[in-house]
């Protein structure tokens, strides 16, 4: 699978360059649709905007669904303030603590986009004596537009209005040592991994014995991405989403994480065991962990009433929902587990 790591990382980098906070995902949807079709696979856009791909396979009675998501965290304009600054609310789990001082774009509905920065209100240390002690929250930060605006009317004249999306700069970098740093690796890195796996199937002429579908969802960050569009015959679903890295967990950015349990409860025991067996068969560097604060697309699938077994794997990602970090080795090990699970 080493031959497909560069492709997977490159496609993730390309997708990371496309703004796609939940609710504003059309360009990302088109990218995913185009890339899977370019590899020769049948792909279609669902009514919700997700991309459903048929990756081939023989038996349709025991089909497998792989799920990843292209939507990310972000913000939305909630108020145009009298001084021309913007009060925003978070979309998904965007956190004001790590979004402070980040460049962003305000995407208007009809008048293009405008650059700005998320700053603490009264952000100058030499002026604000409470700078260090102020708790960062969505009530204490604001978007400062890079436009000559001094009033709400000035901002409205640009075409900015309540409900416009605020997209944060991902700052994507791939280091010479193989580390991948960016906002929104959750879960665009996994979309790149699924594209890399699709390229492996295409280039190697591999046909799984069971039918395999992929669903790239666009509402995962708000909880209902995987709740629809499960093809007939699917009996198992596996989320390919970021693996947690942090205190009390075993996984590193260079490994593939196999989740045994998260906030929604245990994953299917049989699926977890098969994922571990696949990792061992492929000599993948893996860790099994419990994620204390986490939910996935496949749990949305279950809650929607689908009768399936479920699992979750993903490349280890540190600093989740912030400026995240993973590694090429994590990508490789995830690809290895996918191959071992199906072949």
Spans of features found by a protein language model:
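N-terminal hydrophobic/helix-forming segments and targeting peptides
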Residues: 1-343
